[in-house]
Amino acid sequence: MCCLFGFYDYGGTLSAKQKNRIISALAISSEIRGTDATGIAYRTGTKLCIYKRPFPARWMRFRLPAEVKAVMGHTRMTTQGSEMQNCNNHPFYGVADGSAFALAHNGILSNDKLLRLEKKLPASRIETDSFAIVQLLEQAGAIDLDTLRITSELLRGSFTYTVLDDHERLYIVRGNNPFCLYHFPKQKVYLYASTKEILNYALSSIRKSLHGPVEEIAVREGDILCLLPDGWRSRGTFSVRHLYDLRAYDWPLSGVQSTRVQKVSGGSYARELKNLACAFGYTPEDVDTWLGKGLQPEEIEECFYYGEI
C-alpha cells in the first residue's frame, strides 16, 4: 500500500514557494498510505532529479527550483526490499535509449520474478517488485504510449504507476489501483493523488494557491494518460483482462501450478499480502482464510485499501 501524488504547473503560474507548499501538502496527506519512505522526481534544466529518503513525508523538506513544472511523488509502505536501502524507495531512475525517466508504482506485482527470468532482465541491487517495470521500459528502448501499453499488459498483480520522462511528459498508467486527477484550467495546473480523499484533504490546506474552478479528469482502469508541457493531454489504453483472469498461474520459483487463484498461497503475491496484513490489523491466517473462500489476491489487497472484507 503506497500513494502516488504530484502536480503539473504547465502554465508556469505558481511561485517556488507555492510549489513547495503544494508538494509538501500532497506528500503529508499521502502518509495515510505509507510512512516508510518518501520521494519526488522533477526535471530542472537538462537534468532529471530524484530526491528520496527513508522518512515519513512530514520529515521531508522540499526545495523545488522555480522553473520546475512537473513533480511526481510517492509515499511508501514497505512490502519488498528494505526502505533503509534508499535504492529500494520510489521514484526509480531509468534510461531508455539514452533518455532518462523516473517511475513510481503503487501496488504489488505477482510476476516480477517470472518476468526477470522470461525477459532476461539484468541483475540489480534494487529488491522491489516495482523495479521490474523500469527494466522492462529500459529494454523497450522508449517511453511512449505504445511501450507503456505493451509493458502494462505483461504485469500481473495490482498496479497504477506514473512515469516522468526527460521531456517533462508525465504519464499516468491506471491499472486496478485507484487514482484521482484534478485540473485547474484557469490556473493551468494539474494535481493528483492515489485517492480523491487524499487529494481533497491536501486541497483544504492549499486551496488559496489555486484559483478558479476545478474539474476531475477521468482516468479509468486500462487508461494511459500523458500530460504534455503545453497542458494538452494524449491518451492510450491497454487491456486489463489479465488482471481479473482466473486462468492458471505459474510460479516457477516455488514449483507450484494451480488453476485456482486461492491455491497459490505459496506464491509471492500471497506472501506479500500476508506481510501487509498486520499493518491493517489482520493476520497472515486471515489471508489464508480469504484465499480459501475464493477471494482473489487482488480483491484482498483492495479490501485492505478500503477497510472492508
Language model: regions and residue ranges:
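Conserved short alpha-helical segments that host acidic/polar catalytic motifs at enzyme active sites
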Residues: 1-309
